[in-house]
Swiss-Prot record:
Lumenal compartment residues: 28-281, 373-377, 440-451, 523-534, 595-600
Source organism of this protein record: Arabidopsis thaliana
Annotated Gene Ontology cellular component terms: endosome membrane; Golgi membrane
Name of the protein described by the UniProt record: Transmembrane 9 superfamily member 9
Transmembrane segments: 282-302, 352-372, 378-398, 419-439, 452-472, 502-522, 535-555, 574-594, 601-621
Entry annotated with the keyword Phosphoprotein: no
Family: Belongs to the nonaspanin (TM9SF) (TC 9.A.2) family.
The keyword Membrane appears for this protein: yes
Motif stretch (Golgi retention signal): 642-644
Amino acid sequence: MEFYRSSRRLQILGSVILLLSIHVAHSFYLPGVAPQDFEKGDELKVKVNKLTSIKTQLPYSYYSLPFCRPKKIVDSTENLGEVLRGDRIENAPYSFKMREAQMCNVLGRVMLDAKSAKAFKEKIDDEYRVNMILDNLPLVVPIERIDPGQGSPSVVYQLGYHVGLKGQYEGSKEQKYFMHNHLAFTVRYHRDMQTDAARIVGFEVKPYSVKHEYEGQWSEKTRLTTCDPHTKRLVVSSATPQEVENKKEIIFTYDVDFQESEVKWASRWDAYLLMSDNQIHWFSIVNSLMIVLFLSGMVAMIMLRTLYRDISRYNELETQEEAQEETGWKLVHGDVFRPPANSDLLCVYVGTGVQCLGMVLVTMIFAMLGFLSPSNRGGLMTAMLLLWVFMGLFAGYASSRLYKMFKGTEWKRIAFRTAFLFPAVVSAIFFVLNALIWGQKSSGAVPFGTMFALIFLWFGISVPLVFVGAYLGFKKPPLDDPVKTNKIPRQIPEQAWYMNPIFSILIGGILPFGAVFIELFFILTSIWLNQFYYIFGFLFLVFVILMVTCAEITIVLCYFQLCSEDYLWWWRSYLTSGSSAVYLFLYAAFYFFTKLQITKLVSAMLYFGYMLIASYAFFVLTGTIGFYACLWFTRLIYSSVKID
C-alpha cells in the first residue's frame, strides 16, 4: 500500500507542476530598466553596437569600418555577458531631438581609398548588418510579408540593417557593390496625455543607397541636390545608388521621423519577442509527453512486477518466464552495490552534473520571471556564469557524498578533480577558439581583462566553494547499502546481442534527445541566426520532460540489465542517458550543413567548437540525471525485497 500511496503523491505533484508550467508557458516580460520620460526637444542618444553576420559568426566593432565618427568615441560600460557576446557599444554621431523631425541631415563625407573600399566590399560580401541602440531598444528593419495560410500581410522585424548590397546596373552583367549611406529612421513614442512627456517604444530604419550630388566645392554648408530639407526633397528608392570603389566619395545622410504609438512602454518589446510558431512548440511538448507516458507505463509495470510481489511475500508466480526474470535481478544482490571501476572519475562527473543541473534550473526560473529578458543585454550569459561558479558548492557536496559511499578516504583529491576536470576541458577549447577569433581581429575575442575576471571566478570563487562543499559532504555519514556485498565478484553470464553495452547505451540516448530536438532547432536558430529566444516557459516544460525521460529510460534499461544478471550498472546508467549528447552533436552538424551558410573555415571551427562544449555540458547533465534515477531505483528494489 505504501508503494501505491507514494505513486499517487508523485502523480498529484506531477500534475500540479504541469499546470503551473503551462500557466507560465508564455514567459512574461519584466523590463530590465526603469522607463525614461522625454520632453519635446530633449536630446536622444543613439549608440552603435557591433557589426554581425550569420555567414561568418564573427562580430566587429562599428568603427572597424570607416564610417563617420563623433569627435570622441566613448565606450559604454558592459557587463560580462555583453563582452563575451562580442558587443561593443559606443556613441554615434547621429543627433536626434525628441519629437522634432529632421530631413536629409548630412552626417559626413568619406573618400574611399583602396583599403577602405576593400573593407566595405568584404563586409557586404559577408552580409554584415549594422546594429544600433536607442533607449535600450535595438534598431530593426520592418519587412512586410504575406503569410501563406492567412493571405494578409504581416510585419516582421530584422535586427540591424545591411552595410550594403550587391547588384548590377540595368543592361549590365557586371556585379557592383553599393553602400547604404542614407538612413530613414522612425522613432515611435507613447505620449502621456497628462504630462505631455513621451516614452520611446520603437526604433526602426529603412536603409537606402543613393549617390548624393551637390554643386561647387564641398564644405560644411554645402546643400545636396539629391535631398534637401529646404525644398522638402526626400531620398527615393529610384535614386542612383552609391557605388563602393577606390577614390569614390560617399556622403552619409539620415532622416528622423517621430510617430506616436498606442503601444505602451511596458509592451514595447512585444513586437521583437512575438513568436508565430507556438503551435510547433506545443506539438513538440505533446510529442515528448507521449514518450514520457510510454516510459512511465513501463516503469510502473516493472515496479508492480517486482515490489508488489515481494511486499506480498512472494505470491505464486504465474509463469516460469516471470520466475526466471525475477530471479535474475535478485541473484546479483551481492554484487549490485560493488564500487565500479574508475569510481573516482564517476564521482567527479556526477558532481559536475549536479553543478550543471543547478545552474540550468535556477537560470530558467529567473528567465521565466522576466529577469533575463533581452532588454537586459548579456544578462543571460552573465547569470549562467555566476550561477555555475556558485553551484560549485553543490558539485563538491555531491561528488564527496558518492565518494564516501564507495568507501573512499581522500576527499581533497576528489574535490580537486571536481573543481578542475570539466572547467579545464571547456577552457582549453575556449582558449583555442578565442585565439582563432583574435587572429580574425574580431570584437568577439575576449579581452585580457575579461579573461582575468573569468580566471578569478574559477580559481577565486568556484574552486574554494567546491572544496567547502566536498568537506561538508564528507562529514556526513555514508549511505548504507541495502544489501551486503560479496567478497568475491560474481561471474557475469554471456549477454544477448541487444544487451551489448555500446548498443544499449546508444539506444538509451535516442528518447531523451527526441524529447528536446524540436526545441533545440529554435535555440540553434536563435544563437546562430541572430534571433531572439524568449520562450523560457516552453523551454522549462521541455526540460522537465527531458529529466523525466532520462530518468525513466535509464531505469528501464537498468532493470533489463539486472535481469540478465549483469550488475555493472554504475557507469552504464550514466552513459545511457548521457549518450543523448552524441545525438545532439550529430544534429548540430546536420543543422550546420542544412541551415547555415557558413563558408569560412574559421567560422566552421567556431561553430563546431562551441557545439562541442554544449554537447559536453549536455552529456554531464543528462548522465547525472540518469545515474541518480538508477541509484534510487536499485536502492529501492533491493531494500524492498527479502533476500533469501
